Structures are given as structure tokens and as C-alpha cells.
Regions:
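Bacterial N-terminal signal peptides that target proteins for export
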Residues: 1-10
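A structural boundary/capping signal
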Residues: 24-203
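Bacterial N-terminal signal peptides
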Residues: 10-19
């Protein structure tokens, strides 16, 4: 084989590997990689003492949901409607103490929005293993809670600070931990949040 042919073949191979690597990384960034079991947020622990039946659901991991166009409309509507019908207010202002997780009526903190969205989506047929309470840190370092919806297209975020439903890797947050899809009372670490943040900066 001549040198020019070898160089051409090598260039084609290198391009192919680069394209594969890029597409693989892009696909991987659509899904959170979870790791070891970690600590349960104190607010969720206290919530579970009241709502024991909601925190002891064991699920067979059937994989992320296949969401139809109608299903996406339901997800977007629930996110927007809950964001607009509940007035944001801190636990300190409502209860005089921090980390009170509860179903809201007219006011609530971020985790209360999450609980309500989760409850409404479950009532509309979404499985609990694909609706996961998730703890993140905002760019200023403040803790925050969002709802992760696991789908075959990626992990999407419902956030009381944003009416859009966005892929988790397109949000400005550092993802810390979330409920385990197999047990509503267990929490697991999110391993690839830093990788996604670095990738977003490099784009």
C-alpha cells in the first residue's frame, strides 16, 4: 500500500473515531450517571415520616419512559401550571424553620413545587421510577430542588424557576443527588455533573 493511500486511510479512520467519540459523548451527556447510595435530605426524611407509603415504593427498573408528543405536552403543562399557581416562599417565611417538605396549597419552597409536579404527573400515568426528586446547586452555591423526568430522549428537568422543560445538561446547575429509580426512599449520587459543566464551558 502506498504512503499516500495509508495517510488517506488513517485520516478517514481518525475522522470516524472522532465523530463516534463526539456522538457518544453527546448521547451520554443526555443522561445522568448515578453512583453509590448517599444521604437522604433531612427534609425528605421528615416528609417520609408522614407519608410512609410514598417513600417505600420498590420499582423494577423498566428503563426511561418513551414519551409521546401528547406526553410532552402534559409534562410542559404541569410544569408551567404548578409554577404559576403556587407562590414561591421560603420555609422560614412559611413555617419559621428550614427544610419542611410538604404538598403546597398556595405557597411553597422549591421542593414543594417538585412534590406537587411529581404527584400530578403520577396521577396522569407517569411511573414513579421516572419522576425523581433531585438536589442541585445553583451557580451562586445555594441549594435547590428540581424534578427529573427520565425519558428515552434524556433526563429532563422541571424547575420552579423556569417554565421551560430542559435537558439536565442544558441547565446551569451542579447536580448532586437524586432519588434512586428503584426505591423512593433511597438517594444516589450523580457522578457526571462536573463533566457536563466542563463540556458546556468548552462549547
Amino acid at each position: 500500500m502506498s504512503g499516500s493511500i495509508c495517510k488517506t486511510a488513517f485520516a478517514v479512520l481518525a475522522f470516524g473515531l472522532s465523530a463516534f467519540s463526539g456522538s457518544y459523548a453527546e448521547a451520554a451527556s443526555r443522561f445522568m450517571q448515578t453512583g453509590a447510595v448517599t444521604s437522604q435530605p433531612i427534609g425528605h426524611y421528615q416528609f417520609c415520616q408522614i407519608h410512609k407509603d410514598e417513600c417505600s415504593i420498590i420499582s423494577e427498573n423498566s428503563g426511561p419512559a418513551r414519551v409521546t408528543d401528547f406526553g410532552w405536552n402534559v409534562i410542559k403543562d404541569v410544569n408551567s401550571e404548578v409554577n404559576h399557581k403556587i407562590m414561591p416562599m421560603t420555609d422560614q417565611d412559611i413555617f419559621g424553620r428550614d427544610e419542611v417538605w410538604t404538598y403546597p396549597t398556595d405557597v411553597g419552597d422549591c421542593e414543594d413545587f417538585v412534590l406537587e409536579k411529581r404527584r400530578e404527573l403520577m396521577a396522569k400515568g407517569f411511573t414513579v421510577s421516572n419522576l425523581l426528586i433531585t438536589v442541585v446547586r445553583k451557580p451562586d452555591g445555594e441549594g435547590h430542588a428540581v424534578l427529573t423526568v427520565r425519558t428515552m430522549d434524556g433526563d429532563f428537568i422541571l424547575d420552579n424557576l423556569d417554565d421551560r422543560v430542559r435537558l439536565w445538561s442544558e441547565t446551569p446547575y451542579r447536580f448532586m443527588k437524586r432519588q434512586a429509580e428503584y426505591n423512593t426512599g433511597r438517594w444516589v449520587k450523580i457522578e457526571n455533573s462536573q463533566d457536563v459543566l466542563v463540556g458546556a464551558v468548552e462549547k
